[in-house]
């Protein structure tokens, strides 16, 4: 008896069913490194139009978290997809290496500078620590399959980068944007330094909430202003509200809004001045049963009226400020120019000087009456006691409210006026110019434009100086008496930059001023001791990296991509510096992603036990699962992750992998050079399948080009699961396995599968990089083929249907609907035990004229599309079963006629009619012993 199994073309491939990614990926990474994959990608793209995504530098401290993974994977998907779209995509990863967090870590190891260790040794310890942190993070980024110039990253502590940062400072000075002044800045008592806006977090804090009386210096004059002479009784006070009693010793004025209506009100046994709109709310807060309005006047009429400071022997004026609102309080704002930005600005208009009572350590200086030596927060209670003692405290409560905290120490900070260096927002029209540049940028998502526009419109001048040890120095000299910059500052900066380029920032601290100033000037000028804000470091990388490194060929940056918190961080600092130095934005597009939360929308937290550690994911599931999860998510909002969500990504991965494996297994023995069938000679269904792939590719390319990666994944899944998995790949199994190995019927099918596989692997590569690389190695080899899929552009061998194709896409879409209806009835027949599998069925399709004419075009091949042994078409009028879910069609299922063929498993009535092959059907006889069956459609 003949063993017909050997006559079948059974699928065969070495491509494993299981990904086993956690085990295989490291070997692939080694191969990529050994073969210098990144350089191969660069070489393959030489001469093409560039696309530059400038890497925002993560801070070189600690292990990477899931947010880092999202950020770097999104960047990698963009770079790989841009390569496939025909761009040259240099990618230089970077790290932010200076600043306080590293200082604090190093202090814990070696002690504070100039105590147990010299400042120079401390800086070297910081450099060594940062280098170690970079190496750890770098290994993790590489493990995720991120391609880049990992052997030559940019570090803000590289000597050449430090020198370029100094040169950027020089350009800021040259363009007239730098000034020195005493202004209130965010000040961390633990850091002993100012903080950037982006280094401030808001947390809940319990504070005293107090209403305070400032007695009128001249009650009669106040009565007269309110046209209320002789009205009411008791002392007259202006009432302010504050949650920072410690700032009252520095009070120099009370601000009111010139446009608001203010009232003199009888409050029990006293008279108070309040804004009209808040009288009722203050009455309730203070607990006064009844009030009487004695007079009313516009705020501007009260300008410069004098009121007595609650506990110091001086009076303070009422001054006018637009910052005063009726959102809360009393409409009269306690104004301490040392401790608030609005306070400072409005006081400056009236030439009101700052008090200067709080030292760097957050304690009141020794000359401060009543509070000398006390820390500011410690002094709150003492101030309250003093207010009670002098009868100035109208009301005291304790409230929980949002208060600024240091991002690193998590402790409350203060506003404090100190001599600092600033980039002026109004100087040389910087604010207006930056606002104009924002409009020239494409913001993704679009709401990013309004967000940064508001921030730039309202931000204060940028304090760029810090009082730290580990940072790029502000390499300037100021006159000992006048504090003016040296007249040769720009020349000196360049001279110092060259030294830093050779020896790093320590060259500045070791520099003898005589070397650059000469003997005489060295006596009259001193070094500025400050370092630059780390946001200046990273904000100037458009110059220190993109403009400076040769691989960027002088091209400007196309994209910045970071988390949405960077509107006030890196996007902002980069915009300010680039506009100040180059007169334009440093980027053409800015893409932001949301923060990672758990499946319930909660932040990642150890206490909640919902933290997903990236390394645990790739060690268990593989990095491709992490990459697929990132790509599957709409990154414009919050990005949800959990073990369940990752498991779901794993299921999607398996569907894609199974599709790829089916393609590879059925390309067994296929040599494109020898076996490829011309499009016009291919079977109709195969041509349609290739046209489906072309349509999918067009959708996928458009989605990649618009950074809509979740759309890419959805389209990829639809193609694998619906168009291929549940239709085309299902139908072709019979033809692929049972027809002659070298027949047109089979080679046509393999040609389609090969085109589809060549396209599919390229679609996957930006997202499922490891799996795409693995698939690439199993595809049939062709002459001149690249070693890696990552050097390839999207596949150009796909083709669409033409006018010559009678069975067009609309036709096959209708066939899909007929098949869905047939499957529905077959499934019911299976449940009713009429049949076991579809091949045990004979289906009769009762169709209206239109559907009948369509189905008849397939002739005897309709049964292959329906995957039944027999298929008969009859007029709908003859139906003895009801129409189903498709109008104009009724499907009847019966058991197939004849016997089951052991070779093809179809039921046939001609088994036993062939002498030599009596056990198989006539079709199989033709495929085994004859010229092979002919197929035209399916």
Swiss-Prot record:
It is an enzyme of class 6 (ligase). InterPro entries: aa-tRNA-synth_I_CS, aa-tRNA-synth_Ia, Anticodon_Ile_BEm, Ile-tRNA-ligase, Ile-tRNA-ligase_type1, Ile-tRNA_ligase, M/V/L/I-tRNA-synth_anticd-bd, Rossmann-like_a/b/a_fold. ATP binds at residue 606. It is found in: Cytoplasm. It comes from the Bacteria. It catalyses: tRNA(Ile) + L-isoleucine + ATP = L-isoleucyl-tRNA(Ile) + AMP + diphosphate. Keywords: Aminoacyl-tRNA synthetase, ATP-binding, Cytoplasm, Ligase, Metal-binding, Nucleotide-binding, Protein biosynthesis, Zinc. Monomer. PANTHER family: ISOLEUCINE--TRNA LIGASE, MITOCHONDRIAL, SOLEUCYL-TRNA SYNTHETASE. Belongs to the class-I aminoacyl-tRNA synthetase family. IleS type 1 subfamily. This is Isoleucine--tRNA ligase. The lineage of its organism: Bacteria, Pseudomonadati, Pseudomonadota, Gammaproteobacteria, Pasteurellales.
């Amino acid at each position: 008896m003949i063993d017909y199994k050997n006559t079948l073309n059974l699928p065969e491939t070495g491509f494993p069913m299981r990904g086993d990614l956690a085990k295989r990926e490291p070997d692939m990474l080694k191969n990529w490194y050994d073969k210098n994959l990144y350089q191969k990608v660069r070489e393959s793209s030489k001469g093409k139009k560039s696309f530059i995504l400038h890497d925002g530098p993560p801070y070189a401290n600690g292990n990477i978290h899931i947010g880092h993974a999202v950020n770097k994977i999104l960047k990698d998907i963009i770079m790989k997809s841009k390569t496939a779209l025909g761009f040259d995509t240099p990618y230089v990863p970077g790290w932010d290496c200076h600043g306080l967090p590293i200082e604090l870590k190093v202090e814990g190891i070696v002690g504070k500078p100039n105590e147990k260790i010299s400042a120079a040794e401390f800086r070297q310890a910081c450099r060594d620590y940062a280098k170690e942190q970079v190496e750890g993070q770098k290994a993790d980024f590489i493990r995720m399959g991120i391609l880049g110039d990992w052997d030559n990253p940019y570090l803000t502590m590289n000597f050449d980068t430090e020198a370029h940062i100094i040169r950027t400072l020089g350009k800021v000075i040259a363009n007239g944007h730098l000034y020195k002044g005493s202004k209130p800045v965010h000040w961390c008592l633990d850091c002993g330094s100012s903080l950037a806006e982006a280094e401030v977090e808001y947390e809940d804090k319990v504070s005293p909430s107090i209403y305070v009386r400032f007695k009128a210096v001249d009650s009669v004059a106040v009565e007269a202003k309110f046209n209320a002479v002789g009205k009411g009784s008791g002392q007259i006070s202006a009432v302010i509200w504050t949650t920072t009693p410690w700032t009252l010793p520095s009070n120099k004025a009370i601000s009111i809004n010139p446009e608001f209506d203010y009232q003199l009100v009888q409050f029990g046994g006293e008279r108070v001045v309040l804004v009209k709109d808040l009288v009722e709310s203050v009455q309730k807060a203070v607990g006064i049963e009844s009030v009487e309005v004695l007079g009313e006047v516009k705020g501007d009429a009260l300008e410069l009226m004098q009121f007595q400071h609650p506990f110091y022997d001086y009076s303070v004026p009422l001054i006018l400020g637009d910052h005063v609102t009726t959102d809360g309080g009393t409409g009269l704002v306690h104004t301490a120019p040392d401790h608030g930005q609005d306070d400072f600005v409005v006081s400056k208009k009236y030439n009101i000087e700052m008090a200067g009572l709080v030292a760097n350590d957050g304690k009141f200086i020794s000359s401060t009456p009543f509070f000398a030596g006390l820390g500011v927060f410690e002094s709150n209670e003492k101030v309250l006691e003093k207010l009670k003692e002098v009868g100035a405290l109208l009301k005291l409560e304790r409230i929980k409210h949002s208060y600024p905290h240091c991002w690193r120490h998590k402790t409350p900070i203060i506003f404090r006026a100190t001599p600092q260096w600033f980039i002026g927002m109004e100087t040389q029209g910087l604010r207006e110019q930056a606002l104009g540049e924002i409009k020239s940028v494409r913001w993704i998502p679009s709401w990013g434009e309004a967000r940064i526009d508001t921030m730039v419109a309202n931000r204060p001048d940028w304090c760029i100086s810090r009082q730290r040890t580990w940072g790029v120095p502000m390499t300037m000299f100021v006159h000992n008496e006048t504090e003016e910059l040296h007249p040769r500052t720009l020349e000196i900066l360049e001279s110092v930059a060259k030294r830093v380029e050779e020896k790093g920032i320590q060259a500045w601290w070791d520099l003898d001023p005589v070397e650059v100033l000469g003997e005489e000037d060295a006596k009259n000028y001193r070094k500025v001791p400050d370092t630059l804000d780390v946001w200046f470091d990273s904000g100037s990388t458009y110059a220190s990296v993109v403009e400076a490194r040769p691989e960027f060929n002088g091209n400007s940056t196309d994209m910045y991509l970071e988390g949405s918190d960077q509107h006030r961080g890196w996007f902002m600092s980069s915009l300010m510096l680039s506009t100040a130095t180059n007169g334009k934005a440093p980027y053409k597009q800015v893409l932001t992603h949301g923060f990672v939360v758990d499946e319930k929308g909660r932040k990642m937290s150890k206490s909640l036990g919902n933290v997903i550690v990236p390394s645990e994911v790739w060690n268990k599931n593989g990095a491709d699962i992490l990459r697929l999860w990132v790509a599957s998510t709409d990154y414009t909002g919050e990005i949800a992750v959990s073990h369940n969500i990752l498991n779901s990504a794993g299921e999607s991965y398996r569907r894609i992998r199974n599709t790829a494996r089916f393609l590879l297994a059925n390309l067994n023995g296929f040599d494109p050079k020898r076996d490829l069938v011309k499009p016009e000679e291919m079977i109709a269904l195969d041509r349609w399948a290739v046209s489906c792939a072309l349509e999918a590719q067009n959708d996928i390319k458009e989605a990649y080009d618009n950074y809509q990666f979740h759309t890419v994944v959805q389209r990829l899944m639809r193609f694998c699961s619906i168009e291929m998995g549940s239709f085309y790949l299902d139908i072709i199994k019979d033809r692929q396995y049972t027809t002659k190995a070298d027949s047109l019927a089979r080679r046509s099918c393999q040609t389609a599968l090969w085109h589809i596989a060549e396209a599919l692997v390229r679609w996957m590569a930006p997202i499922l990089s490891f799996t795409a690389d693995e698939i690439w190695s199993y595809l049939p080899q062709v002459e001149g083929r690249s070693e890696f899929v990552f050097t390839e552009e999207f596949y150009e061998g796909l083709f669409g249907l033409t006018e010559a194709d009678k069975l067009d896409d609309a036709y096959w879409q209708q066939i899909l609907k007929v098949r869905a209806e047939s499957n529905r009835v077959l499934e019911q027949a299976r449940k009713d035990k009429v049949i076991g599998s579809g091949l045990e069925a004979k289906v009769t399709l009762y169709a209206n004229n239109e559907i009948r004419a369509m189905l008849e075009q397939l002739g005897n091949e309709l049964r292959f599309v329906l995957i039944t042994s027999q298929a008969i078409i009859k007029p709908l009028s003859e139906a003895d079963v009801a129409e189903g879910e498709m109008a104009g069609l009724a499907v009847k299922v019966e058991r197939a006629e004849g016997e089951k063929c052991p070779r093809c498993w179809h039921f046939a009535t001609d088994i036993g009619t062939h002498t030599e092959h009596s056990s198989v059907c006539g079709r199989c006889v033709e495929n085994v012993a004859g010229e092979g069956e002919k197929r035209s459609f399916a």
